[in-house]
């Protein structure tokens, strides 16, 4: 084998030498072939023959290594598995604890309710004792007395406050927004006494929003420039003396001042009804238009409570009846604003009766209608009369269905007939007795 390899090497070198000696050989190829070397032959390893003992020893060693690897794997698995088990146990324990806690809470609530019920029963039994019942009755009576006192005190306070309060109508709306005008109003009424508070009412707003919001945002109606006010004085005497301002001028307006506790009564003889007014009408033009007829007590335009706009009519009360007669002459005449007024005497409306007619309410009318259907008009007429009671015999001159009036002549004739009959019966008895004696 060594000889063959050496011969091959010699042949290669000789071939390369020939190629290099020739002038036509490419230098790159020459370099490649010069650098290339023959592939070395692989060296054969020595084979070792194993005996049975060696095989057994190797198997034992392999088994031990496998056992060690298995033990190490089992240890790792043991180290890993308990963690997952612990997690599962924790989860299971938490869920079990939730249910257990829930049932424990339910049991605790039931026990508390039982304890309360038992305590309530004991308290009820104790309360049933006459001493405690008397105490409870005293407490309830005291509470009732306190509540009655509180109600009475509230009523008394309200009455006192109403005695100190004055209603003012036809005030300019700028009194609410302008501080200077508000001060002028307080000065105008402070001449009669100290003023505690002023409350403004009948404010007309331009938007349909809550009244407090509209008041703070000052969204007042542009076509309504009058407001009402309640002025509370510190003394009732000052409130009574402030009534003298009724009909006086304040900021080019006629004021209507009236007491809250004792308002001015409405006299229909001195009052007129004015119709065909605009919904935006104000009191001041009416004061000026009807002022020529006579001195006026008040001008009241009836307004809608929600919008505070007029309903189209008003009432004007004069101080005497002469003003009413002069105001009636203005019927169907135009105001300076251009609307024709409808003027008439005010009428006192009587409250409507509860029953709709003389026949009674609906229940009685339905019963009467059923009776008419059943027994007719004649039977209904008989029902209204006094009927004879069952079980009593009718006397002479009485009708079993209805009592009739007996004439005096009939009574006299009946008495004469009875007397004659009695006399004839007496004569017969005497004759019969005489015959027996004979």
UniProtKB/Swiss-Prot annotation:
UniProt cross-references to Pfam families, sorted A to Z: RRM_1
Modification Phosphoserine, positions: 94-95
Domain of life per record: Eukaryota
SUPFAM superfamilies in UniProt: RNA-binding domain, RBD (SSF54928)
Biased segments, Basic residues type: 346-357, 402-412
Segments of skewed composition (Basic and acidic residues): 135-146
One CC-aspect GO term: nucleolus
Coiled-coil annotated residue ranges, if any: none
SMART domains, per database record: RRM
Comp. bias (Acidic residues): 60-71
InterPro entries named among the record's database cross-references: Nop12_RRM1, Nucleotide-bd_a/b_plait_sf, RBD_domain_sf, RRM2_Nop12p-like, RRM_dom
Keywords linked to the UniProt accession: Nucleus, Phosphoprotein, Repeat, Ribosome biogenesis, RNA-binding, rRNA processing
PROSITE patterns: RRM
GO biological process, one term: maturation of LSU-rRNA from tricistronic rRNA transcript (SSU-rRNA, 5.8S rRNA, LSU-rRNA)
Gene Ontology molecular functions: RNA binding
Occurrences of domain RRM (ranges): 164-262, 270-348
Subcellular location: Nucleus, Nucleolus
Main location: nucleus
Similarity annotation: Belongs to the RRM RBM34 family.
Function: Involved in pre-25S rRNA processing.
Protein name, as recorded: Nucleolar protein 12
This protein's encoding gene: nop12
């Amino acid at each position: 084998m060594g000889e063959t390899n050496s011969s091959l090497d010699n042949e290669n070198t000789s071939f390369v030498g020939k190629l290099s000696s020739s002038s036509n050989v490419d230098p790159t190829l020459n370099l490649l072939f010069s650098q290339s070397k023959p592939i070395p032959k692989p060296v054969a390893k020595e084979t070792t023959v194993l005996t049975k003992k060696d095989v057994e020893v190797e198997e034992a060693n392999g088994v031990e290594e496998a056992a060690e690897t298995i033990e190490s794997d089992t240890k790792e698995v043991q180290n890993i598995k308990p963690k997952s088990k612990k997690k599962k146990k924790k989860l299971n324990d938490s869920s079990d604890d939730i249910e257990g806690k829930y049932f424990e809470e339910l049991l605790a609530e039931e026990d508390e309710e039982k304890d309360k019920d038992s305590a309530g029963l004991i308290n009820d039994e104790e309360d049933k004792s006459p001493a405690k019942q008397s105490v409870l009755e005293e407490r309830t009576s005291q509470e009732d007395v306190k509540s009655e006192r509180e109600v009475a005190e509230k009523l008394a306070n309200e009455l006192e406050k109403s005695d100190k309060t004055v209603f003012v109508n036809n005030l300019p709306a700028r009194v609410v927004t302008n501080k200077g005008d508000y001060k002028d109003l307080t000065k105008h009424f402070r001449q009669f006494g100290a003023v505690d508070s002023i409350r403004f009412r009948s404010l007309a707003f331009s938007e349909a929003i809550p009244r407090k919001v509209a008041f703070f945002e000052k969204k007042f109606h542009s076509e309504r420039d009058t407001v009402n006010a309640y002025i509370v004085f510190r003394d009732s005497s000052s409130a009574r003396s402030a009534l003298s301002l009724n009909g006086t001028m304040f900021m080019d307006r006629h004021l209507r001042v009236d007491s809250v506790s004792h308002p001015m009564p409405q006299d229909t003889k001195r009052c007129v009804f004015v119709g065909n007014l605009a919904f935006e009408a104000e009191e001041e033009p009416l004061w000026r238009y009807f002022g020529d007829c006579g001195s006026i007590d008040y001008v009241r335009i009836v307004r809608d409570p929600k919008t505070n706009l007029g309903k189209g009519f008003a009432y004007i009360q004069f101080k005497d009846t002469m003003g009413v007669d002069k105001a009636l002459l203005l019927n169907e005449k135009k105001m300076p604003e251009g609307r024709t007024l409808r003027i008439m005497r005010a009428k006192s409306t009587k409250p409507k009766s509860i029953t709709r007619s003389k026949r009674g309410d609906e229940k009685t009318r339905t019963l009467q209608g059923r009776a008419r259907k059943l027994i007719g008009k004649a039977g209904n007429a008989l029902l209204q009369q006094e009927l004879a009671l069952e079980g009593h015999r009718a006397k002479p001159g009485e009708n079993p269905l209805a009592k009739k009036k007996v004439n005096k002549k009939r009574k006299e004739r009946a008495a004469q007939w009875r007397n004659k009959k009695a006399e004839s019966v007496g004569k017969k008895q005497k004759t019969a007795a005489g015959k027996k004696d004979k």
